[in-house]
Swiss-Prot record:
Binding annotation for [4Fe-4S] cluster: 56, 84, 87, 90
Transmembrane segment boundaries: none
Ribonucleoprotein keyword on record: no
Function as written in the Swiss-Prot or TrEMBL entry: Ferredoxins are iron-sulfur proteins that transfer electrons in a wide variety of metabolic reactions.
Binding note for cofactor: Binds 1 [3Fe-4S] cluster. Binds 1 [4Fe-4S] cluster.
Protein name per Swiss-Prot or TrEMBL: Zinc-containing ferredoxin-2
GO molecular function list: 3 iron, 4 sulfur cluster binding; 4 iron, 4 sulfur cluster binding; electron transfer activity; oxidoreductase activity; zinc ion binding
Record-linked Pfam families: Fer4_10 (PF13237)
């Protein structure tokens, strides 16, 4: 199952990381929540195949280590989400539908 496209309304903001919001629940290392508001990445769905990082023309994502997470031990973190040009390349290439993009 991919990211909940309504997470911005359905989940509570539980923190901030590298300038973007984190939506819970968060219980490390097994549950890491959704990172980002403009470009949201469900860290609990992401398998870190790198397709979004390679597809993004404006370098929205950066690798973030998540040791002990069952899906993968690194994630594509949307640390530069404000640079997003809404081309949807990342959404289209993600094999597990872990990304949701919504203009502010």
């Amino acid at each position: 199952m991919g990211i909940d496209p309504n997470y911005r309304q359905n989940r509570q903001v539980v923190g901030e990381h590298e300038g973007h919001k984190i939506y819970g629940p968060v219980e490390p290392p097994g549950k890491l929540g959704i990172h980002g508001t403009i470009v949201g990445v469900d860290f609990d769905v992401c398998i870190a195949d790198g397709s979004c990082i390679n597809a993004c023309p404006v370098n929205v994502f950066q690798w973030f280590d998540t040791p002990g997470h069952p899906a993968s031990e690194k994630k594509a973190d949307p640390i530069n989400e404000k640079a997003c040009i809404f081309c949807m390349a990342c959404v289209n290439v993600c094999p597990v539908a872990a990304i949701d993009v919504k203009p502010p």
